[in-house]
A protein has these predicted regions:
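Activity-critical C-terminal alpha-helical subdomain
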Residues: 81-130
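Substrate-recognition/cap regions that form aromatic- and gly/pro-loop-enriched pockets
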Residues: 1-98
Length: 130
């Protein structure tokens, strides 16, 4: 799981991780990864319109992860966090609409270019709306 948050929120998000990890009934097996980017102008980009910090948390395949990932997401989402589109997250279209200023504009373009929803699947229905 990886989340992008506004760079100025990094300290708050990182400070929550030791508490989350201490409460887990299993060991965390990977280091936490942090990286930074500048803003961009791509509507559904994680870094749209702001300086960004990315925090990634991982577990080995087959190892328990859900309590860790859900607790981490619960920290990042209220910080205007945006989940990595290609990694596991639990958000849906309604919650993502709040995180992306151009979300509805993107959906309008999608409605115009793919009104029959030929280019969709269950994941896209969940994160963009049906």
């Amino acid at each position: 799981m990886e989340y992008e948050i506004p760079r100025e929120c990094l300290g708050e998000a990182l400070a929550a991780l030791p508490r989350i990890i201490a409460q887990l009934p299993f060991k965390v097996q990977f280091p936490v990864e942090v990286r930074f980017t500048g803003p961009d102008d791509v509507w559904l980009s994680h870094g749209y319109g702001r300086d960004s910090a990315y925090i990634a948390v991982h577990q080995f395949s087959g190892s328990p992860y859900e309590p860790y990932f859900r607790a981490f997401e619960a920290v990042c989402a209220p910080l205007s966090g945006r989940p990595h589109w290609g990694k596991l997250h639990y958000r849906d279209a309604e919650s993502l609409r709040q995180a992306y200023p151009k979300f509805d504009d993107f959906r309008a373009v999608r409605d115009q270019l793919d009104p029959g929803r030929i280019f969709t699947n269950a994941y896209l229905d969940r994160v963009l709306g049906a």
